Amino acid sequence: MNDHPAQDAFQHAELDWDENGLPQSRHYGDVYFSRASGLAETEHVFLAQNDLPRRFAAMQPDECLVIGETGFGTGLNFLCAWQLFERSASARARLHFVSVEKHPLTFADMQRALALWPELQAQAEQLLEQYVALNPGYQRLVFAGGRVVLTLLIGDVLECLPSLDARIDAWFLDGFAPAKNPQMWQPALFSEMARLSAPGATLGTFTSAGFVRRGLIEAGFDMQRVPGYGHKREILRGHLQSSTAQMADKPWFARPGRTVRERRAVVIGAGLAGCATAAALAARGWRVSVLERHADAAQEGSGNPQGVLYLKLSAHGTALSKLVVGGFSYTRRLLGHLQQGQDWQACGVLQLIYDDKERQRQAELAEAFPPSLVHPLERDAAEALAGVALTEGGLFYPDAGWAHPPALCRWLLQRPGIELLRHREALDLRRHGEAWQVLGGEGVLAEAPVVVLAGAADAARFEQSAWLPLKRIRGQISALPATARSGQLRTVLCAKGYVAPPRDGTHTLGASFNFQQTDDAPSVAEHQANLEMLEQISTDLYQRLQADPQRTEALQGRVAFRCTSPDYLPLIGPLADPQRFAEAYAALARNARQSVQAVCPWLDGLYVNTAHGSRGMISAPLSGELLAAWLDDEPLPLPREVAEACHPNRFLLRKLIRGT
């Protein structure tokens, strides 16, 4: 039995369109917005009752206002808030919009609905560009160069909000009417809203139902009835009057707090993790220096010509699986900024069955995830899709494909505020006043209040981070010249390795896992192993490529080293002093369930983003958003439990409790 909802639990909205072209939910039998004027209703119920015209105009540079919403629907409320923000707020202010939607509209329905509001065309076009690869869970969409962020939680609101880590400044309590959707309008919802609210948070809602008003008051909001809009005689507005201050139950995972005054950072390492970190910080107004020991970015693990968007999923709702789904969707949206065909290809990925254990695993995955993300194909259908003969079918990921990692790195580094410093090898770190100095062979390379270690396994080369349990695993790819017949391959094929359709006339094949060898020269043995793997994937493709295991000396290839952690999850977040950590939480060594409220001894301004292993194309881009959220105290782009599972302090905690 899997712990994910069955695939039928995820369902797009089913709409009926009336004679005026307005949408109505078939499931709930309710409208998405006022038939009189949805735009004016939004302005009155949500923008005005939350005092957003004044609040946006009063925002300071680098300030971020967070809006929470309980029903995304057509996106009308989001687009109206975004438009008002653009018109009213200072250029360096930011808007973060968190919304929940159980039944998202299909792209076609969203496009049709937004066409009703030509006044919002500028914002609507950007939303539609990013409205792809939306899957259950946390979805991060970025607009206006990072000035506007949408965190869309796809699922039931009563299941999504408890996992959210955010501080909401203004609430849009929206959704279908309480009489139409009573499952949502529960005391548990009002309690979660209070928990997530920043001090003095405001609230607007279209309903004036007495039980809603009483429930919000009981949760800590001061509520009042005010004149409604259109046929609504009254609506509700309110603000958080009282909330119970909660001590962090896991202080070792608590946010370090915003102690940095000057928004400058140094990122060590210009691979995908480092470039994504730099881009996320620059989008928030930080000035970032990226130190790279090579002549350019993406020269090591992120330097392969083709990286596959391969989703290694679990049917059991693991932290890694949630990270993979959220990360995949985010990467897929980023790739839309690159040149299709040259820098990436949305050709899909076909994961082939190769033994009975894999057959069972795939059956569980097909049941656990919606077909829009992954669906099974019998052999005949798989062959027709792939364009080559196969011995088995498998699982097809239609939104996946391959990408050229260096192109994504270069695009990420183009953001204003980022400086790439080449031929700068960081050898040491030292604290200097309120800043960190990064030292090289010739002295100080850079200095800033924040340093992010993003250099794969070399993140552990410094005294402050030497305890990080990182491991290097050699991987070799083989480059096979395409033939007229091999070029008919139309999708990425995966089994125990992968082969991609050609890029620049070459197929990428790989990659080996070599735990012993530590040099970076391609080996004949690993070329031969890659060719054997290709033959297992498709004998037909093997023959079309005229692959010859006796002529591997002539093959081109590339070696890089994956960086992994003991639990195969990345390390993303702030670093603590290991000795002081052990002292602060020593009681946990005697009783792991004991409540300890000591403040975590952070190494102020020192962060890490590494150990993405063979999933870098999936997890590294989103990791930049997660690290920036830790730094800027913004809503996390992943469920809290997933962020904790990626937190570096998990290893200090395990060592304390288990002694290992």
From Swiss-Prot:
<dbReference type="GO" id="GO:0016645">
    <property type="term" value="F:oxidoreductase activity, acting on the CH-NH group of donors"/>
</dbReference>
<keyword id="KW-0285">Flavoprotein</keyword>
<dbReference type="InterPro" id="IPR006076">
    <property type="entry name" value="FAD-dep_OxRdtase"/>
</dbReference>
<keyword id="KW-0489">Methyltransferase</keyword>
<feature type="region of interest" description="tRNA (mnm(5)s(2)U34)-methyltransferase">
    <location>
        <begin position="1"/>
        <end position="241"/>
    </location>
</feature>
<dbReference type="Pfam" id="PF01266">
    <property type="entry name" value="DAO"/>
</dbReference>
<keyword id="KW-0808">Transferase</keyword>
<comment type="similarity">
    <text>In the C-terminal section; belongs to the DAO family.</text>
</comment>
<dbReference type="InterPro" id="IPR047785">
    <property type="entry name" value="tRNA_MNMC2"/>
</dbReference>
<protein>
    <recommendedName>
        <fullName>tRNA 5-methylaminomethyl-2-thiouridine biosynthesis bifunctional protein MnmC</fullName>
        <ecNumber>2.1.1.61</ecNumber>
        <ecNumber>1.5.-.-</ecNumber>
    </recommendedName>
</protein>
<keyword id="KW-0963">Cytoplasm</keyword>
<keyword id="KW-0819">tRNA processing</keyword>
<dbReference type="GO" id="GO:0002098">
    <property type="term" value="P:tRNA wobble uridine modification"/>
</dbReference>
<dbReference type="InterPro" id="IPR017610">
    <property type="entry name" value="tRNA_S-uridine_synth_MnmC_C"/>
</dbReference>
<dbReference type="InterPro" id="IPR036188">
    <property type="entry name" value="FAD/NAD-bd_sf"/>
</dbReference>
<keyword id="KW-0949">S-adenosyl-L-methionine</keyword>
<dbReference type="GO" id="GO:0004808">
    <property type="term" value="F:tRNA (5-methylaminomethyl-2-thiouridylate)(34)-methyltransferase activity"/>
</dbReference>
<keyword id="KW-0511">Multifunctional enzyme</keyword>
<keyword id="KW-0274">FAD</keyword>
<dbReference type="GO" id="GO:0050660">
    <property type="term" value="F:flavin adenine dinucleotide binding"/>
</dbReference>
<comment type="similarity">
    <text>In the N-terminal section; belongs to the methyltransferase superfamily. tRNA (mnm(5)s(2)U34)-methyltransferase family.</text>
</comment>
<dbReference type="GO" id="GO:0005737">
    <property type="term" value="C:cytoplasm"/>
</dbReference>
<comment type="function">
    <text>Catalyzes the last two steps in the biosynthesis of 5-methylaminomethyl-2-thiouridine (mnm(5)s(2)U) at the wobble position (U34) in tRNA. Catalyzes the FAD-dependent demodification of cmnm(5)s(2)U34 to nm(5)s(2)U34, followed by the transfer of a methyl group from S-adenosyl-L-methionine to nm(5)s(2)U34, to form mnm(5)s(2)U34.</text>
</comment>
<dbReference type="InterPro" id="IPR008471">
    <property type="entry name" value="MnmC-like_methylTransf"/>
</dbReference>
<feature type="region of interest" description="FAD-dependent cmnm(5)s(2)U34 oxidoreductase">
    <location>
        <begin position="268"/>
        <end position="660"/>
    </location>
</feature>
<dbReference type="Pfam" id="PF05430">
    <property type="entry name" value="Methyltransf_30"/>
</dbReference>
<keyword id="KW-0560">Oxidoreductase</keyword>
<dbReference type="InterPro" id="IPR023032">
    <property type="entry name" value="tRNA_MAMT_biosynth_bifunc_MnmC"/>
</dbReference>
<dbReference type="InterPro" id="IPR029063">
    <property type="entry name" value="SAM-dependent_MTases_sf"/>
</dbReference>
<dbReference type="GO" id="GO:0032259">
    <property type="term" value="P:methylation"/>
</dbReference>
